[in-house]
Amino acid sequence: MNLRVKHWIYGIFCLLVAIIAIGPELHVASNAHPKKAVVESQVKEKPTQEKEIDNSESHMRTPIDWHKSSETVPYPDLNKVKDFWIKVDLKNNRTYLYDGSKVIYTMYSTGGIYKKDPKTGKLKSVTPTGTFYAQQERGDSFFNQSLKEGANYYVSWKNHGEYLFHSVPTKADGKYNEQEAAKLGKTQGSHGCIRLSVPDAQWMEKNLPVGTKIEIVG
């Protein structure tokens, strides 16, 4: 066998060795890229999901300000709402405006204080619970001499003027009771009515249709 043939055979042998050595790496690389793509896709999708969660509560005004509306977006146009009703959550200090099963606006609120029920021994709010309906009695202001307390922008939902939605309370001089107003959306404090921020109460007085269903829980 001459020298040229030996070199030719040696070259073929080296080429085969190289192909055998590189083959597994090519296989691993081809399998690695799809997995990497899936991981990268999951990483990219995760911030989108977190953003959607954040947006669900992004309209609530923080910190709570009883001088302003509870949300930073406009109040709902009730002319476009098909099934309007209200739910008041006494324990969580929130009033929810609904269109069917969908919450369309949330208001910070303060309901009645909790007292021990002599029959059950359990704490119970002085605000009645159950299903009620908005009544025609409403106005820009009132003052209760016996309680030495008043409020602005009220609308009745029980006993025709006894239980109301209204603003945070006012004192005898007509000024807002800032100590009581600071409880809005944080804790209970009323004598049975539902307190709202000043703009929220004003919207209720002007826009709440007579006969609107109001469910109060807590």
Each language-model region and where it sits:
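Residue-identity detector for glutamine
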Residues: 40-42, 49-52, 135-136, 145, ...
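Exported/periplasmic cell-wall-interacting domains
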Residues: 5-17, 26-33, 146-218
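Gly/Pro-biased beta-strand-loop elements
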Residues: 62-174
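N-terminal, intrinsically disordered, polar/charged segments of Gram-positive cell-envelope systems
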Residues: 24-83
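N-terminal secretory signal peptides that target proteins for export/translocation
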Residues: 1-3
